């Protein structure tokens, strides 16, 4: 004989679990200044290479991520493309990013690299392509930007953006071309909220993305303010940080190879921090926590 109470309880638990999974998959979006839109949270693919990378990226798509962030220097554009091909998610519903390395800032080299990126991933277009670092001492980033604008006109790229750019670098691009980036991906976490760049980006309708959004090493997870908020909202410290970033109009790009962490990082849109709580995390800023100064650091 069926135990009706047990049956009802099991159905209730399963429905609650299903509801939670579906909630994670209901992605929210920011509007870009070029008319396109971008998911409010992305999936970082740094160091996700080969078959392991394909598996992790494919799992991320299954779990509800719709923004995949890669780069030429990550050497995994092929893995990203393979994961997309293996996935049941329609290509048009996935926002795919890659980045131009510093060694290819000159016009012809940059154009060839964009085409090579598309070939490596077996894609017809990128939703977003970024200049990875400005490399101001080399001073070819304007040339690279002009290529990006042309590639957008050719249909190879939907949105053009930059990464690790300071306001003065962006001002130079705009002054010379009249085109503002749609996105600026920068180092950002509770110990470095990058106030100057964030405010500039907001004023110019540029969406800020965060690499290393959880601060490598996890030291921020031990902060009293973050622990108390995690307890209050019944969330993990990582979820508090990621939600904080979306509330300051930042798209975090966390990386997670495990199924559990992938799901957990997405489960952040069912609560909201108060303005005072948002400010309490901004107040954790410390100058020494910044890893790279784009005016000095260069990558090729």
Q: What are the language-model segments listed below?
A:
Residues 48-51, 70-79, 103-108, 136-139, ...:
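Acidic-and-aromatic substrate-binding clefts and catalytic sites of carbohydrate-active enzymes
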Residues 134-300:
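Beta/alpha (TIM)-barrel catalytic core signal, keyed to glycine-rich beta->alpha loops juxtaposed to Asp/Glu
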């Amino acid at each position: 004989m069926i135990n009706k109470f047990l049956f009802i309880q099991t159905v209730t638990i399963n429905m609650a679990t299903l509801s939670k999974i579906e909630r994670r998959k209901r992605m929210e979006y920011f509007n870009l200044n070029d008319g396109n839109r971008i998911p409010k949270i992305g999936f970082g693919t740094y160091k996700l290479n080969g078959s392991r990378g394909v598996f992790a990226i494919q799992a991320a798509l299954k779990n509800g991520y719709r923004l995949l962030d890669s780069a030429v220097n990550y050497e995994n554009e092929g893995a990203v493309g393979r994961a997309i091909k293996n996935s049941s998610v329609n290509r048009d519903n996935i926002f795919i990013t890659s980045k131009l390395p510093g060694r290819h800032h000159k016009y012809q080299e940059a154009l060839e690299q964009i085409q090579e990126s598309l070939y490596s991933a077996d894609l017809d277009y990128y939703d977003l392509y970024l200049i990875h670092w400005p490399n101001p001492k080399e001073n070819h980033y304007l040339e690279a930007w002009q290529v990006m604008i042309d590639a957008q006109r050719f249909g190879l790229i939907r949105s053009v953006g930059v990464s690790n750019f300071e306001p003065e670098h962006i001002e130079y691009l705009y002054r010379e071309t009249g085109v503002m980036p749609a996105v600026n991906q920068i180092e950002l976490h509770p110990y470095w909220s990058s106030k100057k760049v964030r405010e500039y980006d907001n004023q110019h309708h540029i969406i800020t993305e965060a690499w290393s959004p959880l601060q490598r090493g996890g030291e921020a997870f031990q902060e009293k303010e973050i622990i108390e908020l995690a307890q209050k909202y019944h969330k993990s410290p990582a979820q508090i940080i990621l939600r904080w970033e979306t509330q300051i109009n930042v798209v975090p790009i966390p990386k997670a190879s495990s199924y559990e962490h992938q799901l957990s990082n997405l489960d952040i849109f069912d609560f909201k921090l108060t303005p005072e709580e948002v400010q309490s995390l901004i107040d954790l800023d410390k100058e020494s926590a910044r890893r790279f100064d784009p005016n000095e650091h260069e990558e090729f």
